[in-house]
Amino acid sequence: MEKSITNSPVLSILSYCAASILMTVTNKYVLSGTSFNLNLALLAVQSIVCLTAISIGKSFGLCKFRSFNADEAKKWFPIALLLVVMIYTSSKALQFLSIPVYTIFKNLTIILIAYGEVLWFGGSVTSMALASFVLMVLSSVIAAWSDISGAIAVSGSATTTVTALNIGYFWMMSNCFASAAFVLYMRKRIKLTNFGDFDTTFYNNLLSIPVLLIASLLFEDWSPANLAVNFPPESRNLIFFSMVVSGLMSIGISYCSAWCVRVTSSTTYSMVGALNKLPLALSGIVFFGTPATFSSVSAIFVGFVAGIVYAVAQIQKKKAEAALPK
């Protein structure tokens, strides 16, 4: 029974969807303050909390994963490094962009992963999948136009607003490339190492911590003045609590990502992310008061349709492959 649950594609997909929504909303809350600039420190805290929690779980027999092995760690380190780049660029993008825009642009990762599978795993792209890619790009264009025009209308300063959003789009595109590289490389390495889901979570977080801490100490401002700005007395305890909660949330997204990739495929994993964009984008409107304009809702809808078209394309592709003579 337990084995059938851990190998269930449907359950892994639903769990990944729930975890990604919780993680995005929690991170957006922590990063929503314009003064917060210790992104690497936040990510280090998340990894430390996640590693501590699964280690406690292992000691109580709640989960199992391999003991540390230097040779395995050396082989897994590039993936952990890609994970650091992925979550850092994600946190920077969330600082500058609203959740709906962020989630719509994440669709572009699917295109990169699909063509990555063509190059490295002998995959193929059907005409229907190509049509979904066009819709994904269209939804991103609509979202960007809506975001820029809406922000200018609110602030009244076109130059400052466009500059800030351009920074956000730069981090967003960087995140798309990092996410695609992470998913593709992790799928290949999981097959070679035969890692379980908690093995992946353990090594991802363990190897990320020193990289994040060193990078934070080198590149972020740890002066008393900046710490006071990042953690003002009136909200300090709430920020600390939110950072710990986001770390606990990272267990869910880290485990569910590895689980979903293992029991499905990297392309299905990215497709699920696309279908998950509708509730994820709506969470930004519900929890953070993102304006629900005609253009922003249209962008969300087009992005959602793109995900459905892509899902249908993948189903048809699987049926066609199954019909081929063995």
From Swiss-Prot:
Q: Which species is the source of this protein?
A: Yarrowia lipolytica (strain CLIB 122 / E 150) (Yeast)
Residues assigned to the Cytoplasmic compartment are 1-4, 57-74, 124-129, 185-208, 259-268, 313-326
The protein's UniProt keywords, in alphabetical order, are:
Cytoplasmic vesicle, Endoplasmic reticulum, Golgi apparatus, Membrane, Sugar transport, Transmembrane, Transmembrane helix, Transport
Q: Which PANTHER family match?
A: SOLUTE CARRIER FAMILY 35 (PTHR11132)
- Chief subcellular location equals Golgi
Annotated InterPro entries: SCL35B1-4/HUT1, TPT_transporter
Q: How does it assemble?
A: Homooligomer.
**Intracellular or extracellular location(s):** Golgi apparatus membrane; Cytoplasmic vesicle membrane; Endoplasmic reticulum membrane
Q: What does this protein do?
A: Involved in the import of GDP-mannose from the cytoplasm into the Golgi lumen.
- Positions in the Lumenal compartment: 26-35, 98-100, 153-163, 230-237, 290-291
What is the membrane topology here?
Multi-pass membrane protein
What are the leading ranks of the lineage?
A: Eukaryota, Fungi, Dikarya, Ascomycota, Saccharomycotina
Protein name listed in UniProt? GDP-mannose transporter
> What SUPFAM superfamilies would the database entry show?
Multidrug resistance efflux transporter EmrE
Q: Which family does it belong to?
A: Belongs to the TPT transporter family. SLC35D subfamily.
Q: Name one GO cellular component term.
A: Golgi membrane
GO MF annotation terms = antiporter activity; GDP-mannose transmembrane transporter activity
Q: Give me any GO biological process, just one.
A: GDP-mannose transmembrane transport
**Segments crossing the lipid bilayer:** 5-25, 36-56, 75-97, 101-123, 130-152, 164-184, 209-229, 238-258, 269-289, 292-312
